[in-house]
Design a protein with these regions (language model features):
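Primarily marks secretory-pathway-exposed extracellular/lumenal segments that are disulfide-
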Residues: 1-181
Length: 181
């Protein structure tokens, strides 16, 4: 395969030994202006992006398991709007920016790509293991975890042909939004 790091033009067959460079560069955190939400306790909204090194790279999934856990933590609680959801594309897009739900745009959620409503929704595998009730701004604990214990495998995936898997103009793919005070 000519795109492999160890490509050998003289190779006569594919022996499965090709290695490929990772398109992943880093994680990037950005603060979102949430002043229209009229929060009273100094809440701040953050967006977490994966930065990639090429516009044709894509992220189709992220997962956690027994040896590779995920943890997103705060010293307070995560904000969860009453019309919100734990995965961005499960939020009703028509409510975002509506006077009926002025803080919905600042809900805490995970995603792959930036779309409230997509043709192909993200698939959550083993949803019970995500511990989504932890995204609860009124009574919830201060962290969100996945993986790290026996039989805690969990994944969020999109089909590889889903446009949400591709990076934006800054070569970033949105992974989540988290509002906390």
């Amino acid at each position: 395969d000519a795109s492999a790091s160890n490509y050998d033009i003289n190779a006569l067959c594919d022996d499965g030994s090709c290695t490929y460079p990772s398109p992943f560069v880093s994680l990037h955190v950005e603060t979102v202006d949430n002043s229209v939400g009229n929060f009273a306790n100094g809440e701040v909204t953050y967006r977490l992006y994966a930065e990639l090194n090429q516009d044709s790279a894509k992220i189709t999934q992220f997962y956690a398991d027994e040896t590779r856990p995920h943890l997103i933590a705060t010293t307070t609680t995560f904000f969860q709007d009453q019309y919100g959801a734990d995965v961005q594309d499960q939020i009703t897009e028509a409510f975002v920016g509506s006077p009926l739900a002025p803080t919905l745009a600042f809900d805490s959620w995970i995603t792959i790509g930036d779309a409230y409503t997509t043709v192909q929704n993200a698939f959550v595998i083993n949803a019970a293991a995500w511990g989504f009730p932890l995204f609860n701004g009124t009574t919830g604990p201060i962290d969100w975890t996945a993986g790290g214990t026996v039989n805690s495998d969990v994944a969020l995936m999109r089909p590889p042909d889903n446009l949400e898997c591709l990076p934006d103009a800054n070569n970033r793919v949105l992974l989540g939004q988290f509002t906390t005070s």
